[in-house]
Design a protein with these regions (language model features):
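Glycine-rich anion/phosphate-binding loop at the beta-strand->alpha-helix junction
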Residues: 2-155
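Internal helix-turn-beta structural module
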Residues: 137-212
Length: 212
């Protein structure tokens, strides 16, 4: 739905459990949460079953644009992606990308989302390949993006205004908003992958970082 629905689900579940407690004897212990919902926590079940919205953003970038603007060859980024995939496997993380939480957190704060949900929302699968023309195809899939365009913090003045700027406030807007968030993440992934692959990452931080 357009609301994240977490509070609604909690209330409905609590009411249903209350009915069970009233009608069945012998229940010794009852807890509304047992951690299987993995609220505010990254988990494999969210990647497989989805909690929130599952969304994919993809792009094909011309080789000449990468060389001119990002100063990197598509082959460098593609190979870097394979190396990063091995690193992700060895470290046991739930993300084969580089820094999806940065873009997601920025969007969440600006638009009144529950920032604590960045934990499960930032899981991502990054994929790239070279096209027959030597261009770069990239995609990112976010399996559990918990977003809303109505309810909760989305109604706060500035946050609602940001959603309205994106034409994403209110009913029937949440899937559009999810696509925008995924696009922001993909743009950040391409930028950082290019910076690392071209060895501009550290020098850029030194020149433009917060301590300057």
């Amino acid at each position: 739905g357009d609301a994240a629905g977490q509070n609604m689900v909690g209330r409905a579940t609590f009411a249903a459990c209350g009915w069970i407690l009233d009608h069945y004897e012998g229940i010794e212990n009852f807890y509304l949460e047992s951690n299987f919902a993995t609220d505010k926590k990254a988990s494999q079940i969210n990647i497989m079953r989805t909690r929130g919205k599952r969304v994919t953003a993809e792009a094909t970038i011309k080789r000449e644009h990468l060389l001119e603007v990002m100063r990197v060859d598509p082959k460098q980024i593609d190979y870097h992606g394979r190396v990063a995939g091995v690193g992700s496997f060895l470290s046991g993380v739930n993300n084969t990308g580089l820094h999806s939480p940065n873009g997601i957190t920025a969007m969440f704060i600006a638009t009144g989302q529950d920032v604590a949900n960045v934990s499960e929302s930032s899981a991502a699968m990054m994929y790239s390949e070279l096209t027959d023309d030597g261009d770069l195809y990239v995609s990112i899939t976010i399996p559990s993006l918990i977003v809303a365009t109505y309810g909760g913090g989305t109604g706060i003045g500035t946050q609602r205004e940001c959603l309205e700027l994106l034409d994403c406030y209110g009913r029937d807007r949440v899937y559009k908003f999810a696509e925008i968030v995924a696009s922001v993440v993909l743009a950040g992934e391409i930028s950082l992958a290019s910076a690392i692959s071209s060895s501009d990452w550290v020098s850029s931080h030194e020149q433009y970082g917060r301590n300057r």
